[in-house]
Amino acid sequence: RQMCIRDRKISFSIIALLALLIFVLYPGNDITCLDIVPPATANVQSAQAGDVLKMDIPHSEHKLTLIFIPKGSYPITKSGHRTEITYPYWLGKYEITQEEWEKMMGWIPIPELEDRWTITTGARYPMCQVSYDECLDFCDRLTEIARQQGILPEGYCFSLPTEAQWELAYSCGKEIVLPDNLEKVAWMDFHDANTGAYPVGQKEPNAWGFHDMLGNVWELCADFYHSHRLHGRNPVNWKTDTGNLSTDTGLSVTSLGGRVFSFIPDNEKEIPRERYHADSRRASTGLRVALVPVQQHQLLKKRLKHLHPVPDWLMDIRYSFELIYMYMKTYWKTLTNL
């Protein structure tokens, strides 16, 4: 009988160890490339680069304006790689304004400063102080209203753009570097601690017609944060690892285009990107929406659904095993090269 109990304990220990190793080494339903074939509907096939789609905002004289972007690519400056988007989409001409948010959602967050920015309020000022999940809820609401108005392209819905989609619109197919006419397209007074955001569309647009891609508020992207820019075909980072998922901050996502570029050294020409905690609400961070294939938004929602909270002690164990695994992998590689 004692032998039977001991065998059961050993079996249970082995199963528990295997389960822990799977938890540590298997990343789950991670996605790094969007393999999407959007429906070839008439309104997509007939659209041309730069075509404008306008959506009525309930109880507002202003319209939400989006610009059509056909499939394209752009070079990654430092690495020499290229990033390619193989399907068309629409991106907001402006950052989402406070009026657009309030009319669609019925509320505006109470300004509670978490950083040194001053919150500037007004109908045409960019929306800020919103979390990642709240931005996705806003996109779902836009999709619902656009469908009711009969203007939603078949097979498409509103979502946050991926980092690559944002950068293609910013770069206009060229290198993702700061423009020579920076003062004409972006606000340059970030050094003033009392300065908040400005009304959208006050600066010149880029070559494809987008305003405030630099220099107003940071703009949230759909990607989970990664330390470097991705490249390749339809890249996206929906992989949870120790770089973007931690016990004290939760999920971290990417934001682009903020005014921190005024501190960038002269020899650093790439546009700024920042790590943003998904649950945070900052006066310096807002959003710009995109119309993307439904599959893209569904994949994001499905990925987020699988991000269940993990106890701190279990994450500590996971990190320990990851370190051991990385050490053993390096050690084995060294031995095989001898």
Language-model regions, residue ranges each:
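Active-site microenvironments of metalloenzymes and redox enzymes
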Residues: 83-183, 222-233, 291-303, 309-314, ...
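Short, well-ordered junction/capping motifs at the entry into regular secondary structure
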Residues: 184-214
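Mature N-terminal segment immediately following signal peptide/propeptide cleavage
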Residues: 65-73
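Short, small-residue-biased leader/transition segments that mark boundaries at the very start
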Residues: 1-5
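Hydrophobic membrane-insertion alpha-helices, especially the h-region
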Residues: 13-24
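Ser/Thr/Pro/Gly-rich low-complexity linker/stalk segments immediately outside membranes or between
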Residues: 28-44
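N-terminal Sec-pathway targeting helices
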Residues: 6-14
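Surface-exposed recognition segments
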Residues: 81, 194-196, 213-316
